[in-house]
UniProtKB/Swiss-Prot annotation:
HAMAP family, sorted: FabZ
Protein name: 3-hydroxyacyl-[acyl-carrier-protein] dehydratase FabZ
Designated gene of the protein: fabZ
SUPFAM superfamilies reported for this sequence: Thioesterase/thiol ester dehydrase-isomerase
Catalytic residues (UniProt): 64
Length: 163
């Protein structure tokens, strides 16, 4: 991944792995919409790699497509965004209690290779810009050495409204 242009201080090669317990503390998504199983190579304010193990038991495979299961491209982009939210939450030390990270925009989305049951998606996300509570990212989802999807996207931290 290339060097990020961020306004936050950059950490020097601080790598960390993030397990599912911490992911559940960092983002509000739950089954059937939690699309990150673990994260690796976390560098504060810079980058992260999310991992999604795709199984035939995913609910979307029931209708997309019967007899030819393919993960919907928009869900691959969502998985990239969730990976970015984990990076953002950990970098800003935001827990889900009282705050939510919202997906703001997606640009230049491209879908290259289908993702099928049994695939492991490696979601490489890097910060391209950060200001206060808004981050911009570039993400690439890979299966093996093939690019499945890529996009640029943005997210922001907001107070969770009381219902």
């Amino acid at each position: 991944m290339s060097q990020s242009k961020v306004e936050e201080p950059l950490a020097k090669e601080v790598l960390a792995n993030i397990d599912i317990a911490e992911i559940l503390n960092r983002i509000p998504h739950r089954y059937p919409f939690l699309l990150v199983d673990r994260a690796e190579d976390y560098r504060p304010h810079q980058s992260i790699v999310g991992i999604k193990c795709v199984t035939i038991n995913e609910p979307f495979f029931q209708g997309h497509f019967p007899g030819n299961p393919v993960m919907p491209g928009v869900l691959i982009i969502e998985a990239l965004a969730q990976t970015g939210a984990v990076l953002m939450s950990k970098s800003l030390e935001v827990e889900t209690e009282g705050k939510t990270i919202f997906f703001m925009s997606v640009d230049n989305a491209r879908f290259r290779t289908p993702v099928r049951p049994g695939d492991v998606i490696r979601m490489e996300v890097e910060v391209t810009r950060a200001r206060s509570s808004i981050f911009k990212f570039k993400g690439v989802a890979k299966v093996g050495d093939k690019v499945a999807a890529e996009a640029e996207f943005a997210a922001m931290v907001v107070e969770t409204p009381k219902l």
